[in-house]
Amino acid sequence: MRFQLFYILGLLSVTSLTQAANNLVCYYDSTSYLRQGLAKMHTNELDLALQFCTHLVYGYAGLKSGTLELFSLNVDLDMFYYKDITALRQKFPQLKILLSVGGDRDVDEAHPNKYVELLEANRTAQQNFIDSSMILLKRNGFDGLDLAFQLPRNKPRKVHGSLGTYWKSFKKLFTGDFVVDPLAEQHKSQFTDLVGNIKNAFRSANLMLSLTVLPNVNSTWYFDVPKLHPQFDYINLAAFDFLTPLRNPEEADYTAPIFFQDEQNRLPHLNVEFQVNYWLQNHCPGQKLNLGIASYGRAWKLSKESGLSGAPIVHETCGAAPGGIQIQSAEGLLSWPEICSKLSQNASAQYRGELAPLRKVTDLTQKYGNYALRPADENGDFGVWLSFDDPDFAGIKAVYAKSKGLGGIALFDLSYDDFRGLCTGQKYPIVRSIKYFMG
């Protein structure tokens, strides 16, 4: 596969590389310690990866409803892990270590809109968030805070027949798009003001501040880019999970394509290029942007009606396929080593049913991504369609980031990479590929 990576270097044109991407922001989900078996990750297993990472983002803290204070989501775990993580600076003195808040880990069914409530809060309530953040960061030796606020998301693409597509286009002439947040403009201004106040407080305390744009959070709704970017040390674009089996149960497609594929009524903003260009065209310096890559894949369940070819868009899917046995964190989610073990070159061809290998289909254009599939059997069972970025395609995205003059790559996250070397014997293959092709 390496020859394809050199091919993409030519495709993107080395002459367009304005400046080498240097950042490798590595996210670490602390709950990986609570997993079972081979997915359980200890802090000492981070060492090999951290020789490549420039930043480590520890996830995740939460926002306490009511008081709007920053707080630990798992006190029993974090009271030990905070110190263990920040102590890594002794081995890696150049490493910047930040604490992330939100990140879709702050599940609060009673207060699902509490991050919007923080934006709408008065200055006194917002000061609770700022003060509690500074105390927690300073007490535990973090270099700064990463804002991965769980703001309202774009509505998922709906499946329409030809008549439905025509009617939707006709209806939009009169009604426009569905409004997710009618106060988005107000919230954009409030977010800008809040970030400015956080930055002013952090500046005197010598603390960093970064932003993570979570998947499907609409940047046009909440982020006033020209006013915001000076307040952040860097901005991480989680440019993946554009489609998932939970958001899009009836059709499977590339979850993180680099470019727009103008076919089958795809939406033009569901790709890396659109997201990156939005920030660049709104005057955010490229060196402040880090392109987010997922080290996991998303799997749909195929039906007999889904067909045999697997060429996306795949219709008549039935939601999420079973998730990884080791991770057990979400339906349809598999870590890279779990994906690797299921591919036909690594799994026995003699297996049948749910253990039968998946056939990998490589994107020779290197624009959209790779996928793997196992068609449903004669009873409509065991069908799987899986979209993922393997180490090679992660390297291609690193080259893309260089071609756009971006600051680097943000990897979500280390615990989903092959940190044990189960696939090929090499540990952290995705991290290594990204670092190699960033130069």
From Swiss-Prot:
Residues 22-439 form the GH18 domain. One of its GO terms (molecular function) is chitin binding. It comes from Drosophila simulans. Disulfide bonds join C26-C53, C340-C423. CDD domains: GH18_IDGF (cd02873). The gene is Idgf1. Belongs to the glycosyl hydrolase 18 family. IDGF subfamily. Glycans are attached at N122, N218, N346. This is Chitinase-like protein Idgf1. It comes from the Eukaryota. The lineage of its organism: Eukaryota, Metazoa, Ecdysozoa, Arthropoda, Hexapoda. Lacks the typical Glu active site in position 150 that is replaced by a Gln residue, preventing the hydrolase activity. Its precise function remains unclear.
